[in-house]
Amino acid sequence: MDKPAIKPQGSYISYFSNLVKQHGGINLAQGIPGFQPPSELLEALRSVINENVHQYAPGIGNHKLIEVIHKHYAKNYAVERDNFLVVQGATEALSLIYTYFNKLLGNDLCTLSFEPAYESYSQLPSIFGKRFISYPLDQDFSFSVDEFRSTITQNGVKVVFVSSPGNPYGKVWSEMEVKTLINLANELDFYLVFDAVYNDLYFDKPPYLPLNEISPNVFYVNSFSKMLCITGWRIGYLYAHQQHRAGLRTIHDYIGLCAPSVQQVALAHYLGHYSFGENFATIFRGKVRDNFNNLSVTLSKLGFYIPPTDGGCFIWAKLPKTITDGFQFASQLYSKAGVAIIPGEHFSKTHTHWVRLNIARPAQEIKQAEERITQFLSIK
């Protein structure tokens, strides 16, 4: 009998991903795209490398980049240029917003997110010593408005995080659901943080974005990391009501200062000349969708359950009935088959029998992972 693996402290994502980086294998653990960025973007980077762009960027973001972002959204939404803030990826955007909430609300800060919740949503409250509530979706992956309202009021929830498509479970929230959450935020006076990092990776219809409903209670977060396969560039942005502009910028000045200058200049050039990366995003989306379809079929044949999924770059899968411990399964899968995945308990204490697999990888790599998982289960 295999000796049970010891659970690490900290992020399971970092733990399993670092195993691959140190010892090799297939990394389906961390959300790292397995594709090169657009060639035109890399050419833009080469073209600006000798320009005077190697010092601090403006704290609010490169002005040309902000202009390109604003122009893109202004086609469909009533957005104001000055309400955008460029930051060091969506991770900084989330932590910046949460730090701002902590300053505003202090001990009254209670946060909620829907199960399974992305790690930042639960770990930020933990770092600050604040309450976090993990709210389960219904059997059909919807939510009861009355029960949700009751949870908000009874627990004094002040912040709700929602991502669309989600991570680890790729639910795309419908227009009606998003508007319901916004109406509740305005009515019950909590802050809704809408995380749209995966909004280009949808399988059917584009996700609904709440940029026409921005009020003092609604915040919007996005990033170029996944959209353009540049997770190492650390360029993201947020949009918030002008009421919060000064407060967010002040905190950003001291905990983030500015996003990388060279990358911002290159991005501004590329996005402005190549339709905001639309062609690249379309091709990338197709590859991820194909990987989802192919790997889902294989996993289903092996006894996994894959819930209806609308987008994102992950498969959220329930383990076969004979396997009940996702962490031990993930540990053995890596040690014996060299495939790194993430145990579901990292995202929800009640999902110990689930796992997350990154599908934003080359098709050949996904195929190799399928073969290794199949072989591993055949001899387990």
Predicted regions and their residues:
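Aromatic- and carboxylate-lined catalytic core of secreted/periplasmic carbohydrate-active enzymes
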Residues: 63
